[in-house]
UniProtKB/Swiss-Prot annotation:
The lineage of its organism: Eukaryota, Metazoa, Chordata, Craniata, Vertebrata. Residues 603-1193 are annotated as: Domain II and I. The keyword Signal applies. Binding to cells via a high affinity receptor, laminin is thought to mediate the attachment, migration and organization of cells into tissues during embryonic development by interacting with other extracellular matrix components. Ladsin exerts cell-scattering activity toward a wide variety of cells, including epithelial, endothelial, and fibroblastic cells. The gene is LAMC2. Its main location: secreted. This is Laminin subunit gamma-2. Disulfide bonds join C28-C37, C30-C53, C56-C65, C68-C81, C84-C96, C86-C102, C104-C113, C116-C128, C139-C150, C141-C155, C157-C166, C169-C184, C462-C470, C464-C481, C484-C493, C496-C514, C517-C531, C519-C538, C541-C550, C553-C570, C573-C585, C575-C591, C593-C602. InterPro entries: EGF-like_dom (IPR000742), Laminin/Netrin_ECM (IPR050440), Laminin_IV (IPR000034), LE_dom (IPR002049).
């Protein structure tokens, strides 16, 4: 068998040095950033996975392309890596953090380290240089308070800062902050005080939503308030919403961002946001804050810019009224503080236009809370005037009330108006202690009714369900129900409390009383929002559970989700990802295996293999037979059973070596074939790119032809327009000539009229010639471009078919054919227009001839007055124009015919190209199939090898774990007798102590009663007896507390005694200690009795003294002396006897408490040991500890 393993390892090691990535990500995991990797033996030895990715894309780097290159960053793990663009002079390195912020040199600031801090200048390779004017000892300014460099030795302070160094806030301001444009923050104090300072009781608190588990209470609404769909991305852990219409959708913040956010004034609200598709122009209403009847909005970016598409960016908004923060409308200081005190809505725009999608993440609101931590100096501590109290002067002091309850803490406090100057309620003004307000008489309303604040003499019924009582809020005069039943909350008792669900008023259907959520103990009871208050659907399942009631295991887990022990609930399937289906596992934990895999976790390859693996199997069987024969020979030689000829052994070794060389040669041939195939594929891609570029050139040529055709159309239209104008001119001339009265020869005035007519005819003839020339030029250009386009098509198709590689883009060629059809149609249209132009020109020519004939028939016209030669020349031009148009028409017809031939030739070439493409596609698919099969066989071999190694490693680790568990169990078993002894001793001591202290508690109670009687008798020694009473109370309370603690310990120890009854015989060893405790308890009892006797004597003495005091007439001087002596003896007796006894009782009680604490600590240790034993017992494997060997040699 060792030889068999050696052969398998050799075979796989020869195939492992180079491997290309396959579809099995478990073998070559490059996070989708690379398609190639190699095997690294050293990496496999260190991490268990030896595949290292090559040529990572998207600016990534690392073994699995899991990180960005140096100088790049990304917000999330799956995002693209973006360049840091750090300024080379101002940054320490080219690296940046996950937000793209670079590490700057001294004196440099900015996200890219591209500018100097205030007080610095001249950015160089060493950073920025500090302004020497600020370093001058005469100009020692506080950087947080200056508005710029000092001027002539004097610091220039910000508006709210004062002092020679600009290091103090002006009166009415506090918290000097360099990031505040004003320098300091104005005191708020609800307008009641202008004196304040930074509070030292508050620390920084961030209210965040990171969406790690769900939408965290966020919602999405339309602009009109109707709900929209909000989705949570488990992969990116953010939320997003999409729009199907132009109306925008808004993200709506949950309650934790609302309410009284007064301590967030001047701080920031930030979030990560990106938008995909749609319009990306910011609006003035991108971020909306509402509260206290006020509403302000702000854009995400300046309105002239555009939001980046598909790029996550952090947006930050400062919560104050400064104009630089772009809130609109601009509120006053107190209006902004009033809005934050009662913030009712925070909305952030999600979509921009139709089919737009917006994503939001990492929403953070900087706030503060009164706990220890990083200080929050922006929270104020007001110094209140008379009549006010509280940190912010928000309450009225005792003896004062609000002049207007509607204004709440903004209202002025005025003195109470009660009879006798009594105190009153600071909010309502109602007088206390029977003092009535003389101006107002309030009716005494029964339960279920309340006083109308506008008419205190009348009662109105409470708007509460089932007649619960109610009250009126003084600030808002809102009627709020009190004493809602368990599980019900709300101003009208209309909502179910947290942890309950139902519909008590039936607002969403039938009435359903509130009842506890049924989540099967699979939620965190300390968390809020575990279930939907209306439907009861569980929202925060834990222990790997899921479902409406957390009664199912999550995908990829199995077990009993209803088990009482969390460890027995849902556990991971632990399926081999390479051999199992992605559906998870069955209810018993067994995995659903892919074909060819088996085992509980699909970690073993099945015996049946695909048919394509038969040749590999046959070859491996032959190798196995040869290895078995070699193993038999070696065994004989080692056993001495016979002498094996060296020649036979050498022959077998040579055969094995030859077989291994054949395997190596086959692997190298396969690698060479794969490399050759890769080169061929690269050549095909290169030729395809070249062909694509030629097709692009052809597209451009066709576009130029179409542009020239458009120009030709324009020129034809111009020619048509000129012909129309010429016809109109000729018609006007004819009409004028027809209306002309030709006089006799003796009345002839001159040749000027006919001369002008001849000139007009000449001008029209010249325009016809020019139009015909333009048509001829355009036709020639169109023909040239058509020939060029046809030549390009022939050349591209010829090269594509002749190369036999790549597949021509059929859609592009078909588009070119369509464009040729359009060109042909255009040429036909031009032909028709040219024909029409020829007809119009001929008509004009005939009309001109008729005019000329009319002129020649005129009588009495002298040849000299009418230039006959000029008319003949015009006629010749018209004839030449007609012939020119005829010639152009012939050329157009020839071009049309040629276009038809070219079309047929192009279609034939296209058909040839398609057939060639089909052949090349077939060859390419066969090559890809062969390549994929080879890679799959290689990957399967690699996977099998590593599976065997993993199994061997797990078996060795399991063997070690079994040995460790066994040793722990044996050690724990040895400690059982010692633990049992400790538990028995503790039980005995606890019982004896309990019995001993029982009488001490009763005696202490009697002492307390006696001290109380003594207090009532004598007023002169009231202070001493009072202290005695206080001490007795403390002693009694301690005794009672110890008694209760002993009772609880007794109940716990009874459970232990039931399991350890066999140890009762060993209790005798501790009787001495018990006897000592009893003796001390008896001493305590005796002293307590003595204390009782002493107290009784003291009481008798005090009775006598009081008796004497009640009879002053019968007391003489001797009686007074006797009275003083008795009083002195009573005091001495109390100080010398009673007080030491009480001190001793207190000391005994303290010692008993110490003994009880030691007992509790010992019992806790014993219980911890018992719990540890139970864990060891649960973790021990069932059955026999001595397992058989995995292999028999």
């Amino acid at each position: 068998m060792p030889a068999l393993w050696l052969g398998c390892c050799l075979c796989f090691s020869l195939l492992l040095p180079a491997a290309r990535a396959t579809s099995r990500r478990e073998v070559c995991d490059c996070n989708g950033k690379s398609r190639q990797c190699i095997f690294d033996r050293e990496l496999h030895r260190q991490t268990g996975n030896g595949f290292r990715c090559l040529n990572c894309n998207d600016n990534t780097d690392g073994i699995h392309c899991e990180k960005c290159k140096n100088g790049f960053y990304r917000h999330r793990e799956r995002d693209r890596c973006l360049p840091c663009n750090c300024n080379s002079k101002g940054s320490l390195s080219a690296r940046c953090d996950n937000s793209g912020r670079c590490s700057c040199k001294p004196g440099v600031t900015g996200a890219r380290c591209d500018r100097c801090l205030p007080g610095f200048h001249m950015l160089t390779d060493a950073g920025c240089t500090q302004d020497q004017r600020l370093l001058d000892s005469k100009c020692d300014c506080d950087p947080a308070g200056i508005a710029g460099p000092c001027d002539a030795g004097r610091c220039v302070c910000k508006p709210a800062v004062t002092g020679e160094r600009c290091d103090r806030c002006r009166s009415g301001y506090y918290n000097l902050d360099g990031g505040n444009p004003e320098g300091c923050t104005q005191c708020f104090c609800y307008g009641h005080s202008a004196s304040c300072r930074s509070s030292a009781e508050y620390s920084v608190h961030k209210i965040t939503s990171t969406f790690h588990q769900d939408v965290d209470g966020w919602k999405a609404v339309q602009r009109n308030g109707s709900p929209a769909k909000l989705q949570w991305s488990q992969r990116h852990q953010d939320v997003f919403s999409s729009a199907q219409r132009l109306d925008p959708v808004y993200f709506v913040a949950p309650a934790k961002f609302l309410g009284n956010q007064q301590v967030s004034y001047g701080q920031s609200l930030s979030f990560d946001y990106r938008v995909d598709r749609g319009g990306r122009h910011p609006s003035a209403h991108d971020v909306i804050l509402e509260g206290a009847g006020l509403r302000i909005t702000a854009p995400l970016m300046p309105l002239g810019k555009t939001l980046p598409c598909g790029l996550t960016k952090t947006y930050t908004f400062r919560l104050n009224e400064h104009p630089s923060n772009n809130w609109s409308p601009q509120l006053s200081y107190f209006e902004y503080r009033r809005l934050l005190r009662n913030l009712t809505a925070l909305r952030i725009r999600a979509t921009y236009g139709e089919y737009s999608t917006g994503y939001i993440d990492n929403v953070t609101l900087i706030s503060a809370r009164p706990v220890s931590g990083a200080p929050a100096p922006w929270v104020e501590q007001c110094i209140c005037p008379v009549g006010y109290k509280g940190q912010f002067c928000q309450d009225c002091a005792s003896g004062y009330k609000r002049d207007s309850a509607r204004l709440g803490p903004f209202g002025t406090c005025i003195p109470c108006n009660c009879q006798g100057g009594g105190a009153c309620d600071p909010d309502t003004g109602d007088c206390y202690s029977g003092d009535e307000n003389p101006d107002i008489e309030c009716a005494d309303c029964p339960i279920g009714f309340y006083n109308d604040p506008h008419d205190p003499r009348s009662c109105k019924p409470c708007p509460c369900h089932n007649g619960f009582s109610c009250s009126v809020m003084p600030e808002t005069e809102e009627v709020v129900c009190n004493n809602c039943p368990p599980g019900v909350t709300g101003a009208r008792c209309e909502l179910c409390a947290d942890g309950y669900f139902g519909d008590p008023f039936g607002e969403h259907g039938p009435v359903r009383p509130c009842q506890p959520c049924q989540c099967n103990n699979n939620v965190d009871p300390s968390a809020s929002g575990n279930c939907d208050r209306l439907t009861g659907r569980c929202l925060k399942c834990i222990h790997n559970t899921a479902g409406i009631y957390c009664d199912q295991c999550k995908a990829g887990y199995f077990g009993d989700p209803l088990a009482p022990n969390p460890a027995d609930k849902c556990r991971a399937c632990n399926c081999n990802p390479m051999g199992s289906e992605p559906v998870g596992c069955r209810s018993d934990g067994t995995c659903v295996c892919k074909p060819g895999f088996g085992g509980p976790n699909c970690e073993h390859g099945a015996f049946s293999c695909p048919a394509c693996y038969n040749q590999v199997k046959i070859q491996m069987d032959q190798f196995m037979q040869q290895l078995q024969r070699m193993e038999a020979l070696i065994s004989k030689a080692q056993g001495g059973d016979g002498v094996v000829p060296d020649t036979e052994l050498e022959g077998r070794m040579q055969q094995a070596e030859q077989a291994l060389q054949d395997i190596l040669r086959d692997a190298q041939i396969s690698e060479g074939a794969s490399r050759s195939l890769g080169l061929q594929l690269a050549k095909v891609r290169s030729q395809e790119n070249s062909y694509q570029s030629r097709l692009d050139d052809l597209k451009m040529t066709v576009e130029r032809v179409r542009a020239l055709g458009s120009q030709y159309q324009n020129r034809v239209r111009d020619t048509h327009r000129l012909i129309t104008q010429m016809q109109l001119s000729l018609a006007e001339s004819e009409a004028s000539l027809g209306n002309t009265n030709i006089p006799a020869s003796d009345h002839y005035v001159g040749p000027n009229g006919f001369k002008s007519l001849a000139q007009e005819a000449t001008r029209l003839a010249e325009s016809h010639v020019e139009s015909a020339s333009n048509m001829e030029q355009l036709t020639r250009e169109t023909e040239d471009y058509s020939k060029q386009a046809l030549s390009l098509v022939r050349k591209a198709l010829h090269e594509g078919v002749g190369s036999g590689s790549g597949s021509p883009d059929g859609a592009v060629v078909q588009g070119l054919v369509e464009k040729l059809e359009k060109t042909k149609s255009l040429a036909q249209q031009l032909t028709r227009e040219a024909t029409q132009a020829e007809i119009e020109a001929d008509r004009s020519y005939q009309h001109s001839l008729r005019l000329l004939d009319s002129v020649s028939r005129l009588q009495g016209v002298s040849d000299q007055s009418f230039q006959v030669e000029e008319a003949k020349r015009i006629k010749q031009k018209a004839d030449s124009l007609s012939s020119l148009v005829t010639r152009h028409m012939d050329e157009f017809k020839r071009t049309q015919k040629n276009l038809g031939n070219w079309k047929e030739e192009a279609q034939q070439l296209l058909q040839n190209g398609k057939s060639g493409r089909e052949k090349s596609d077939q060859l390419l698919s066969r090559a890809n199939l062969a390549k994929s099969r080879a890679q799959e066989a290689l990957s399967m071999g690699n996977a099998t090898f590593y599976e065997v190694e993993s199994i061997l490693k797990n078996l060795r680790e399991f063997d070690l774990q079994v040995d460790n568990r066994k040793a722990e169990a044996e050690e724990a078993m040895k400690r059982l007798s010692y633990i049992s002894q400790k538990v028995s001793d503790a039980s005995d001591k606890t019982q004896q102590a309990e019995r001993a202290l029982g009488s001490a508690a009763a005696d202490a109670q009697r002492a307390k009663n006696g001290a109380g009687e003594a207090l009532e008798i004598s007023s002169e020694i009231e202070q001493e007896i009072g202290s005695l009473n206080l001490e007795a109370n403390v002693t009694a309370d301690g005794a009672l507390a110890m008694e209760k603690g002993l009772a609880s310990l007794k109940s716990e120890m009874r459970e232990v005694e039931g399991e350890l009854e066999r140890k009762e015989l060993e209790f005798d060893t501790n009787m001495d200690a018990v006897q000592m405790v009893i003796t001390e308890a008896q001493k305590v009892d005796t002293r307590a009795k003595n204390a009782g006797v002493t107290i009784q004597d003291t009481l008798n003495t005090l009775d006598g003294l009081l008796h004497l005091m009640d009879q002053p007439l019968s007391v003489d001087e001797e009686g007074l002396v006797l009275l003083e002596q008795k009083l002195s003896r009573a005091k001495t007796q109390i100080n010398s006897q009673l007080r030491p006894m009480m001190s001793e009782l207190e000391e005994r009680a303290r010692q008993q408490r110490g003994h009880l604490h030691l007992l509790e600590t010992s019992i806790d240790g014993i219980l911890a040991d018992v719990k540890n034993l139970e864990n060891i017992r649960d973790n021990l494997p069932p059955g026999c500890y001595n397992t058989q060997a995995l292999e028999q040699q």
